[in-house]
Amino acid sequence: MEEEKHGWQAIAAKKKQIQRALIRQYATCETQTTQGENPNRPAGVAAFGELTEKLSRGELSCEDVVKEQICSLTEILFDNAISRAKQLDKYFQEHRRPVGPLHGIPVTLKDQFDVAGFDSTIGYVGRAFNPATRDSALVEMLRSLGAIIMAKTNLPQSIMWCETENPLWGLTVNPLHSGYTPGGSTGGESALLASGASILGWGTDIGGSVRIPAHMMGLYGFKPSSARLPYRGVPVSTEGQEHVPSSIGPLARSLDGIHTAFKSLIELKPWDFDARCAAIPWREDIYQETSKRPLVIGVLFDDGVVRPHPPITRVLHFAVDALRAAGHHIVDWNAQLHAECVQLMDRFYKVDGGEDIREAVKAGGEPFIEHVQKLVDCGDPISVFQYWQLNRRKWELQQQYLEKWNAMRCAKNNRPVDVVIMPPMSHTSVPHRSCRWVGYTKVWNVLDYPALVIPAGNVCAQDIGASWSFESRNSLDEWNKKLWDNCKEVMASLQLPVGVQIIGRRYADEAVLAAGKVIDDVLRASA
């Protein structure tokens, strides 16, 4: 007989019981197995563009697409999704046109975006059974574009980590190997997308939480400048802080999904939905101009703190060689100011002495996961005056980095640098609870620069024997070296994905997406 659970464990057990009961309703989805019965059934339609085309022509029904996606999902808005799909199919039958550019596209959300009638737990037991009364601005906008909200996905306790684990829902695993992480904090999304169980996912990024999972799972992930997309109705730990704002961003298995989703949302004028959004329209002229000429690309191989593993460096060298061969100009970038930006970010994380997260965990009574325990045990809160000095230093660093970027020019044509490319992390996916250093992504949150991750390669057998002998710079560098030595054979056997990160100036989101398309096309053609 199962032992009766009490306190936070009873709450978690009840949530999972409800979840599993709802899943069982769809455990055996209706599929058309008769050969030739429907050649356009959605099975195998992985590309975002192919799916939108078939839906817009009426070759697929929204209901069929949703039912097929449900077969692989674990979070539960299924009844609502089927109902919405039927509404969209009826609209198409009556009007012979789609509702919008995301008509019928199944969408999943990190368990942070409010959906009326459903919890937004953000990994806390104390937020369970407290459903939102209103959709978040993003959900309102996605629905108006024709998207179908399918599910909400797992994230770490407090959100503030690059792996995905909490006492309420448990540990999210990598579909390639259950002993490895899919990244975080948007790890539920990356695991679903990599499994083929979602078409378009949405997460948030305050230190790499969209880009790291994309890198680890071979996906596309975009962190826009923070004020481009609406944060209204998206609860978060340390809510109210403005020193390093979090960004909302998409993940997908294709870049056209990222581009279409972001552009379509901007064209809905997010500033009419959220007072914090900048009134910057979609600038097609910037996108087209960037797309049609040779790019000046800065490249940074090493942030000076933690050396990347051999496959990370090899893949970036491959990208640089391919881009140079395609006629683009490469400029050596440096890591000046990066370490100080990361150190400042770490201080910002701790300004309240861990009070916000401590109180949220206390409300549910669950234990802290190890990383969160360390975060809340970070010391005492600082004074308002001390906090102001940190913000002053942030502005100084942002100005210094702007001047650094302005000073970097291509020696051949004196053009400024369009984008910088660099690793998203020092390693690929790793065994659970092994991540330590996120400086390769975090720096761009301090600066609030847009950053895109694209898949660029995989760990392979030749990486195992690569020369990688050096004296460690610090304890983090030593940890990273041991991680490679201990895991390289498994990483190679799994052919773990490796991404490349593409960064642009603040608010140059259209230029980053355009450069991303150019770079992605070059890499695909050179593979």
PLM features: what roles do these ranges have?
Residues I312, C341-D352, V430-R436:
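Short glycine/threonine-rich loop-to-helix capping motif typified by GTGT followed
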Residues M1-T34, N38, R253-P281, Q288-T290, ...:
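Acidic-enriched catalytic cores of C-N bond-cleaving enzymes acting on peptides and small amides
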Residues E59, E63, I70-R127:
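N-terminal, positively charged, Ser/Thr/Ala/Gly-biased leader segments
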Residues E59, E63-E68, M141, H317-A322, ...:
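Classical protein tyrosine phosphatase
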Residues G49-S56, F301, P308, L337, ...:
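Serine-dependent amide/ester hydrolase catalytic core
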Residues M1-K90, A325-G327, D477-W479, M491-A492, ...:
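An N-terminal boundary/leader segment
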Residues P101-I248, L300-D302, V351, V420-C435, ...:
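Short glycine/serine-rich loop/turn segments
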Residues E140, S144, A194-L300, H317-A326, ...:
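Structural helix-boundary/capping segments
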